[in-house]
């Protein structure tokens, strides 16, 4: 669920996903086209691809189960589809954390007209 994704980003990356990544580059936020502009935008591209591979549940609307163990997010539950959503979100949150140093404000509210290049495949 997107609200859980926001929570994971806060826990792992220590910042608001909605504020920092809700409209960043070509892939963070709604939609996505063109080429990722930097490492943080690539996190969103990979996350979009990950969601695209999920079958049998809705990544944006379905709630999943996770726990925290020694500071790490551990995806759980009996539903493999929902667990897959959790793994997508967890990986993206870690990616955001690992690329905070190269986050560039020039890609915040980046105009879609700058994302016209052909997209690479997942």
From Swiss-Prot:
SUPFAM superfamilies: Phospholipase A2, PLA2. Its EC number is 3.1.1.4. Belongs to the phospholipase A2 family. Group II subfamily. D49 sub-subfamily. Ca(2+) binds at residues 27, 29, 31, 48. Its cofactor is Ca(2+). CDD domains: PLA2c (cd00125). GO terms for molecular function: calcium ion binding; calcium-dependent phospholipase A2 activity; phospholipid binding. This is Acidic phospholipase A2 4. It is found in: Secreted. Disulfide bonds join 26-115, 28-44, 43-95, 49-122, 50-88, 57-81, 75-86. It catalyses: a 1,2-diacyl-sn-glycero-3-phosphocholine + H2O = a 1-acyl-sn-glycero-3-phosphocholine + a fatty acid + H(+). Snake venom phospholipase A2 (PLA2) that has high lipolytic activity. PLA2 catalyzes the calcium-dependent hydrolysis of the 2-acyl groups in 3-sn-phosphoglycerides. Pfam families: Phospholip_A2_1. GO terms for cellular component: extracellular region. SMART domains: PA2c. Binds 1 Ca(2+) ion. Its main location: secreted. Keywords: Calcium, Disulfide bond, Hydrolase, Lipid degradation, Lipid metabolism, Metal-binding, Secreted. Expressed by the venom gland. It is an enzyme of class 3 (hydrolase). It comes from the Eukaryota. One of its GO terms (biological process) is phospholipid metabolic process.
């Amino acid at each position: 669920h997107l609200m859980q994704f926001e929570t994971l980003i806060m826990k792992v990356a220590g910042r608001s996903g909605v504020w920092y990544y809700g409209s960043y580059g070509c892939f963070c936020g709604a939609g996505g086209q063109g080429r990722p502009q930097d490492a943080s935008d690539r996190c969103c591209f990979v996350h979009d691809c990950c969601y695209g591979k999920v079958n049998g549940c809705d990544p944006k609307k379905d709630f999943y189960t996770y726990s925290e163990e020694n500071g790490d997010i551990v995806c759980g539950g009996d539903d493999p589809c929902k667990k897959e959503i959790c793994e997508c979100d967890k990986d993206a949150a870690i990616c955001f954390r690992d690329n905070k140093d190269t986050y560039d404000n020039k890609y915040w509210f980046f105009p879609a007209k700058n994302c016209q290049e052909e997209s690479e495949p997942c």
